[in-house]
Amino acid sequence: MSLRPLHDRVIVKRIESETTTASGIVIPDNAAEKPDQGVVLAVGPGKKNDKGELSVLSVKVGDRVLFGKYSGQTVKVNGDELLVMKEDDLFAVVEK
């Protein structure tokens, strides 16, 4: 099974954040209150603006993005947990 997002939705695979520093210090979950990261797996075609024109999304497949801990809806596809969310739920694209 595969997913094709509609409108301004994106499908993101969460990247687990590091829980140990380079020096070996373990970071407890409650101390790691920072945005989650993920990789965009699929993007919808966009959504129509007030003029009826299609506004394409700012993110593309392969982008690494930041989003809130409770953003999106979790779905399980072929054993993987993926997130379906609106582009507005994304905070930023991580530039290399």
From Swiss-Prot:
Keywords: Chaperone, Cytoplasm. SMART domains: Cpn10. GO terms for cellular component: cytoplasm. It comes from the Bacteria. One of its GO terms (molecular function) is unfolded protein binding. PROSITE patterns: CHAPERONINS_CPN10. One of its GO terms (biological process) is chaperone cofactor-dependent protein refolding. Coiled coil: none annotated. Gene3D superfamilies: GroES chaperonin (2.30.33.40). It is found in: Cytoplasm. Heptamer of 7 subunits arranged in a ring. Interacts with the chaperonin GroEL. Belongs to the GroES chaperonin family. Together with the chaperonin GroEL, plays an essential role in assisting protein folding. The GroEL-GroES system forms a nano-cage that allows encapsulation of the non-native substrate proteins and provides a physical environment optimized to promote and accelerate protein folding. GroES binds to the apical surface of the GroEL ring, thereby capping the opening of the GroEL channel. This is Co-chaperonin GroES. The lineage of its organism: Bacteria, Pseudomonadati, Pseudomonadota, Betaproteobacteria, Burkholderiales.
